Each structure stands twice: as C-alpha cells, then as structure tokens.
Amino acid sequence: MRLSRGLYPRFVTLEFDMKTIQTLPRVLSMAAVALASVLLAGPAHAQSCGGDINDDGLVNSGDLATLLSNWGACAVSAPTISQVAPNSGPASGGTVIYIGGTNLNRATSVTVGGVAATVLAAYPTVIVATTPPSATGGAKTVAVTTPGGTASANNAFTYGAATPSWATLLEAAPDPVVVTSASLRAAIAASGFAWRVRDTATQIEMVLVPAGTYTMGCTASNTFGCAAAENPTRQVTITNAFYMGRYEVTQAQWTARMGSNPSNFQSASAQVPLAQVPSRPVETVSWTTVQGFRTATGMRLPTEAEWEYASRAGTTTAFNNGSSDDNTAVNIAWYNANALSQTRPVGGKAANGLGLHDMSGNVWEWVSDWYGAYPAGAQTNPTGPATGTNRVLRSGSWGYSANFMRSSYRGFNTPAFSGIDIGFRVARNP
C-alpha cells in the first residue's frame, strides 16, 4: 500500500508491509508525542536535536521518514575469532578462556568441541568463558554464535588426554622408548585418551590401542608358511580406540576376583622363585569360565580382529617385533625353545610397539569370536561368525614352536575346554 501525506514541510512517500501497517498507529502516536514535546519545549534552535536523524537542524517529517524507512531488525555483523587463550586445559573442564575477535558482544552460544561453554562475560572484541568437561582429549573447535552468524576456530583448544572413569592414570602420553612409531604415537594422541592406565578395581594395567586399519591374515615367517585358516587376507578397520591388558591376566588377579586359583603352575621352580609365582599367567581356564571374570570386573575379551590388530602394532611381518626371522621369536616369546615346559611371570619378554607383552607365547589367549573361515573382502569391526562349535585362541604358548608365535596364527578349542597352557587377557572400552 502507498501512503502520501502533505501535512509536513516536506512531502513524504513511503512503502509499508502489512506488519508495519498494523503497528503504524502506535508508531505515529509515539512520533506525534515526541514532536509535540519538541514544539512545546521552545524554538528549534534551543533544543538539543537528539531526534535530528538526518542532521538538517530540524526534528520533523524527514526524521520520521528515515525512522520508518529503516523499520525492522537491524543488520548484525558476523562474528570473527582471531585467537583463543589459553589454548589447552584438562579434560575435566573449568579452564577460563579468552576468545578474541570482533562482533562478539551479542553471543548467544559458545561451544568447545560442540559442547556448551559457560559464558562469564561478552564484549565486542572478547568473550570470557569456562570450558566444559570433555569425554575425550585432543584438539577441539571453538565456536561463537551471534544473531549475525557463527564463527569457528578449528583445533583452537586442546584437552589433555582423558582418563576413563574406571581407571587411574599412569602415563597420559605414550613413551617414545616403548611406542617407537611416530604414527602410532600420533594416533594415540588423536584418540584423546590416556595411553597407559590401571583399572582401579582390579589393578590390571592397560594400554590404549588406537583406531586404525590393517591387513589381517597370513604373514609367513622365513621358515613357516601360513595355514589355510589364515587366508584370505583382507583390510580390516577398527573404528574405535580400546584398552587392552598390558599383560595376560595373572594368577593373583584371577584369585582376587574369583576366590580360587585353577592354575597348574602354582609352585616355584628353578626359573621362577616363589615370590614371582602370583605373576605367572592364570591358566587352565575355559572360555566359559572366563565369562565369570569378565562379568565380575566389567572387562571383556577382545575380538579376534582387535587382538591381531593390537598384536601387530603397525607391523606387517610374521612376528610383532617387525621381523619374519624365526630366530628372533626368542626376544618376544616364551615358547618351546626357551620356556622349559612352564609358564613364566608376565612381562618377561620385550613388548610390542604398543607396549603389550606376551602377545606371542607364554599361554594361549581366548578371544570373543566363534572360530570360522575368514570371509573375503574388507571388513569393519568384524566379530566373527554368529554361531559355532569352537572359540578362537591366539598367541601360541610355552609348549609350541615359533610357527605358532606368528601374529596371524589361529588356534581354537571348545568353550568348555581348559588346558594348562590356556589363559587370556582383557579389553575394555574407554
């Protein structure tokens, strides 16, 4: 609708939408009151001219025209972020941060890693806020939202490595002497979780296995080829980081939870003094019996794919020490060439590239999967066949040759079977 009136010194022509028309009487009334107050106050030259919008020395229809022509929401400039300080803090949150930039004073939301922060103060060029807790550590995006839009600063704030609620921190960052691969250290850091922790309830030490992709299956040694069950090889992706016991579960750890010790090797020997017997791996435990320990502790068995991924620790060779030479198995495993027909205290051989010990030899280790032929093609987080007769065993033991120490070797037995060279290690989600 077009409205023209000649009641003022200047002719005013304006365009209105329906909403403006509905509010026009109130606006005109307010304007009339304002103009009347100006007139009653005396000559134009004596007033402050606070209403002189167009700066012509008069408060009149021209000013009203300017007001009405700009009726509606005011434009708001988009925010920007130039810096965040400090740029790091604990995963527990509570760090006071200063977000510098422009057009920040009308902030409606501030987030760190997608989680709302607590805003303490907001000014045009700086926001003061406290960081929220983070379920994971690592670099996070800081974002500020105003009526003018959202500004984001990628990786602007880094949380320290998070320790799971069930654990006690031992080492946040991987020891480069143990985790020698820079890519593995980077993957552990990127996960946002601490590298080495201790389960508070059981005192079982665990290390983080980061997410990743590897080739699962046959890797022959210089002496031994692969069994048919180790083929076909295929790409396997583990999408989530998980913790794995640094050592096989010991007799002491089992007894503390289950109340009795089923192991065959409960006595001292010429090689194992009495004080070290509790640190021998528990054995003579069936897959079925292990479920009781799992339930009592909140732990789980690793899947077969997780186990091999953790054992390899980035290697593509027969053995997890980066070699395919059978003579090097003696450095990482207790097997028939050096064990003297008995288990040995856990951790006595060199760790692999993640800090895991005895992933070859000492005792066979139950995993969660039913045993079956490998499917062809790439897989993500495989869990094995849905049903079966036997459960998978990995790692070889003190009674077997170097062939069985290879990372890809697969064993199996019925869930009810327990042998004097069969134990396990645990896994747990963060």
Provide a role label for each language-model segment.
Residues 29-39:
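Bacterial N-terminal signal peptides
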Residues 76-106, 149-162:
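Beta-strand/beta-sandwich contexts
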Residues 42-46:
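Sec/Tat signal peptide C-region and signal peptidase I cleavage site
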